[in-house]
């Protein structure tokens, strides 16, 4: 079996902005909060980190500064996906050079690669680096869904360390876990974290843990320990917040939530716009 290089909750960190620029001092505050909460891995420049509207130079500086700040206290997983294989491979090499411990690489989006294209893409990207690569399957955003039968072939790529599964299909994830029991799977959806871990998943790459890192990690660790009654109860308590964090497109609500709890991360870059007043009031009512 490929041993998972982390288990439990990993936070898909928001990218804080100030005056339109990356707010590095705030990023360090966010990282410190995650470490203090017991989070052992953080994704920088994932979907929640607004990777689509960050330049490569900004991404590499975020990777470098994040790793320099956390040292060995936390794994830095760099989001380096692209729908251009050459670009994804080049950015992945640069991220490794900037100190990233691992990479999160989304499936090529928009151009709708075939299964053979997906295999070639991940083989090329993983072959360009010497650190673990996590595939990221999120068909609602990319327009492509990795078929279950392709995962067995993907799992043979030496440093392809597993997959963040955000297809939202529990039946599909159940088939994946049964067909490829030696291939690590992390839930990409907070509301399905316990279900995925009950099927053999290794944890969750979480939006929720930006706001509630202690509680998210407690839920994940209970599930990993086989205490699914406790894990399910903890998740039930968190479901109202999870629903609020996804009442509009991610990361609009989570950035609003961070400001409400005292971490001013700024707004999102266009084309994402501020949270509606109606939903913001619901979020305030829950958090304040």
Locate the predicted segments by residue.
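Active-site beta->alpha loop and helix N-cap motifs at the rims of alpha/beta catalytic domains
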Residues: 2-11, 15-143, 151-152
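Secondary-structure boundary/capping signal
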Residues: 74-75, 133, 162, 184, ...
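Catalytic cores of TIM-barrel enzymes
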Residues: 2-5, 175, 258
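Catalytic alpha/beta core domains of metabolic enzymes, predominantly
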Residues: 127-128, 139-246
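C-terminal alpha-helical cap/extension of soluble enzyme domains
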Residues: 8-15, 33, 37-39, 198-201, ...
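Generic alpha-helical structural signal
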Residues: 28, 60, 64, 89, ...
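Short secondary-structure transition/capping segments
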Residues: 54-57, 90, 115-118, 146-148, ...
């Amino acid at each position: 079996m490929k041993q998972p290089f982390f288990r439990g909750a990993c936070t898909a960190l928001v990218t804080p902005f100030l005056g339109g620029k990356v707010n590095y001092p705030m990023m360090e505050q966010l990282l410190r909060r995650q470490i203090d909460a017991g989070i052992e891995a953080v994704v920088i420049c994932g979907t929640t980190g607004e990777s689509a509207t960050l330049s490569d130079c900004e991404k590499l500086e975020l990777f470098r500064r994040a790793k320099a700040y956390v040292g060995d206290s936390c794994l830095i997983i760099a989001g380096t996906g692209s729908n251009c294989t050459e670009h994804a491979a080049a950015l992945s090499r640069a991220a490794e050079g900037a100190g990233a411990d691992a990479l999160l690489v989304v499936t090529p989006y928009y151009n709708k690669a075939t299964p053979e294209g997906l295999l070639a893409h991940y083989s090329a990207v993983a072959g360009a680096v010497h650190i673990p690569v996590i595939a990221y399957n999120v068909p609602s955003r990319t327009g492509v869904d990795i078929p279950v039968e392709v995962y067995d072939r993907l799992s043979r790529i030496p440093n392809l360390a597993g997959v963040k599964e955000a297809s939202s299909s529990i039946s599909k994830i159940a088939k994946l876990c049964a067909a490829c029991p030696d291939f690590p799977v992390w839930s990409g959806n907070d509301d399905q974290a316990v279900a995925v871990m009950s099927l053999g998943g290794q944890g969750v790459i979480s939006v929720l843990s930006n706001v509630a890192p202690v509680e998210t990690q407690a839920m994940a660790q209970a599930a990993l320990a086989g205490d699914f009654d406790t894990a399910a109860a903890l998740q039930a308590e968190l479901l109202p917040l999870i629903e609020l964090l996804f009442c509009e497109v991610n990361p609009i609500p989570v950035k609003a939530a961070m400001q409400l709890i005292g971490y001013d991360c700024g707004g999102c870059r266009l084309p994402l716009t501020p949270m509606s007043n109606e939903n913001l009031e619901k979020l305030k009512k829950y958090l304040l």
